[in-house]
């Protein structure tokens, strides 16, 4: 009894420490602008590290306890060949790291139905699964595959390589056979006319994959040029390379677009290239900068070839020559001083001057204060 009580107390102690630490740092994380999901991932990682160290027996997270319960419920069904356990993925095309003895792969939708992609682990080793980087939703979503789903599937990796997954006869591992890869490329406009604005046009690409799997839908960004002439806007499509027989390019409205079309008159478009819908890339920006530099060089060459006449610098007429300076001071009765205050009443002025020198009738006078009147 004492040993059993000790076994139940130690996991609770560790869990209480983890909960206290997470609750204490939650406010600090929120003040620093860190999302709470990061805190939950930290908690999950901490629990997984503790379970991997085997320092505490019976320490299981809620997700793993749910996995064990589901496995026990579906144990009679696992003995039949037409039932399999799988995990629904939380993010598209993301594999889950696990221990060496667990075979787990990412499998797309079946041939008969457009079901979401799933992660299929080995049913015999599901209790040893390492869910270090799995979220709570992905770990808890443990369902049974419907009848009719064969164990032979195909997957599409992040790098574009198509792999075929074949379950071995012993049911303990999967064999990957590389197939043809499908790569969706982005077509970039080679050059653009002066005064044009580049507008992205989205097209759907239906690429049938080998093995009879339903076509995978991708997106190709086809840039176009928009020329603004007055109140009209002309759209000039760029030439697109001929597709392969395994691909068919279809526009978003369902009409087939030829490789080259004449300029069409359309209503003015308002383009948005910022935010989540931004389709501009670094390559497009680099090409636009190179084009602007080339245009400036062409203008400089044209100006040098046409006139080759040196233009007068800006504000050249504002420069004061020495002759103008001499004419300005060739006057009599000059006063150079500081003014203390000035009063004005209609056309009468009264000056209070100080610390100055004045030239009157060819003689210089120095004064500290002076008062004068004038009318004009």
Curated annotation (Swiss-Prot):
<keyword id="KW-0805">Transcription regulation</keyword>
<dbReference type="GO" id="GO:0045944">
    <property type="term" value="P:positive regulation of transcription by RNA polymerase II"/>
</dbReference>
<dbReference type="GO" id="GO:0005672">
    <property type="term" value="C:transcription factor TFIIA complex"/>
</dbReference>
<dbReference type="GO" id="GO:0097550">
    <property type="term" value="C:transcription preinitiation complex"/>
</dbReference>
<feature type="site" description="Cleavage; by TASP1">
    <location>
        <begin position="274"/>
        <end position="275"/>
    </location>
</feature>
<dbReference type="GO" id="GO:0006366">
    <property type="term" value="P:transcription by RNA polymerase II"/>
</dbReference>
<dbReference type="GO" id="GO:0016251">
    <property type="term" value="F:RNA polymerase II general transcription initiation factor activity"/>
</dbReference>
<dbReference type="GO" id="GO:0061629">
    <property type="term" value="F:RNA polymerase II-specific DNA-binding transcription factor binding"/>
</dbReference>
<feature type="region of interest" description="Disordered">
    <location>
        <begin position="247"/>
        <end position="266"/>
    </location>
</feature>
<feature type="modified residue" description="Phosphoserine; by TAF1">
    <location>
        <position position="281"/>
    </location>
</feature>
<dbReference type="InterPro" id="IPR009088">
    <property type="entry name" value="TFIIA_b-brl"/>
</dbReference>
<feature type="compositionally biased region" description="Low complexity">
    <location>
        <begin position="89"/>
        <end position="105"/>
    </location>
</feature>
<keyword id="KW-0539">Nucleus</keyword>
<dbReference type="GO" id="GO:0005634">
    <property type="term" value="C:nucleus"/>
</dbReference>
<dbReference type="GO" id="GO:0017025">
    <property type="term" value="F:TBP-class protein binding"/>
</dbReference>
<feature type="region of interest" description="Disordered">
    <location>
        <begin position="69"/>
        <end position="107"/>
    </location>
</feature>
<feature type="modified residue" description="Phosphoserine; by TAF1">
    <location>
        <position position="280"/>
    </location>
</feature>
<dbReference type="GO" id="GO:0051123">
    <property type="term" value="P:RNA polymerase II preinitiation complex assembly"/>
</dbReference>
<dbReference type="GO" id="GO:0005829">
    <property type="term" value="C:cytosol"/>
</dbReference>
<comment type="subunit">
    <text>TFIIA is a heterodimer of the large unprocessed subunit 1 and a small subunit gamma. It was originally believed to be a heterotrimer of an alpha (p35), a beta (p19) and a gamma subunit (p12). TFIIA forms a complex with TBP.</text>
</comment>
<feature type="modified residue" description="Phosphoserine; by TAF1">
    <location>
        <position position="316"/>
    </location>
</feature>
<dbReference type="GO" id="GO:0001091">
    <property type="term" value="F:RNA polymerase II general transcription initiation factor binding"/>
</dbReference>
<dbReference type="InterPro" id="IPR004855">
    <property type="entry name" value="TFIIA_asu/bsu"/>
</dbReference>
<dbReference type="GO" id="GO:0003677">
    <property type="term" value="F:DNA binding"/>
</dbReference>
<dbReference type="GO" id="GO:0005654">
    <property type="term" value="C:nucleoplasm"/>
</dbReference>
<comment type="similarity">
    <text>Belongs to the TFIIA subunit 1 family.</text>
</comment>
<feature type="modified residue" description="Phosphoserine; by TAF1">
    <location>
        <position position="321"/>
    </location>
</feature>
<feature type="region of interest" description="Disordered">
    <location>
        <begin position="274"/>
        <end position="329"/>
    </location>
</feature>
<feature type="modified residue" description="N-acetylalanine">
    <location>
        <position position="2"/>
    </location>
</feature>
<dbReference type="GO" id="GO:0005669">
    <property type="term" value="C:transcription factor TFIID complex"/>
</dbReference>
<comment type="function">
    <text>TFIIA is a component of the transcription machinery of RNA polymerase II and plays an important role in transcriptional activation. TFIIA in a complex with TBP mediates transcriptional activity.</text>
</comment>
<dbReference type="GO" id="GO:0046982">
    <property type="term" value="F:protein heterodimerization activity"/>
</dbReference>
<protein>
    <recommendedName>
        <fullName>Transcription initiation factor IIA subunit 1</fullName>
    </recommendedName>
</protein>
<feature type="compositionally biased region" description="Low complexity">
    <location>
        <begin position="69"/>
        <end position="79"/>
    </location>
</feature>
<dbReference type="GO" id="GO:0060261">
    <property type="term" value="P:positive regulation of transcription initiation by RNA polymerase II"/>
</dbReference>
<keyword id="KW-0804">Transcription</keyword>
<keyword id="KW-0007">Acetylation</keyword>
<feature type="compositionally biased region" description="Acidic residues">
    <location>
        <begin position="280"/>
        <end position="329"/>
    </location>
</feature>
<dbReference type="Pfam" id="PF03153">
    <property type="entry name" value="TFIIA"/>
</dbReference>
<keyword id="KW-0597">Phosphoprotein</keyword>
<feature type="binding site">
    <location>
        <position position="343"/>
    </location>
    <ligand>
        <name>DNA</name>
    </ligand>
</feature>
<feature type="binding site">
    <location>
        <position position="344"/>
    </location>
    <ligand>
        <name>DNA</name>
    </ligand>
</feature>
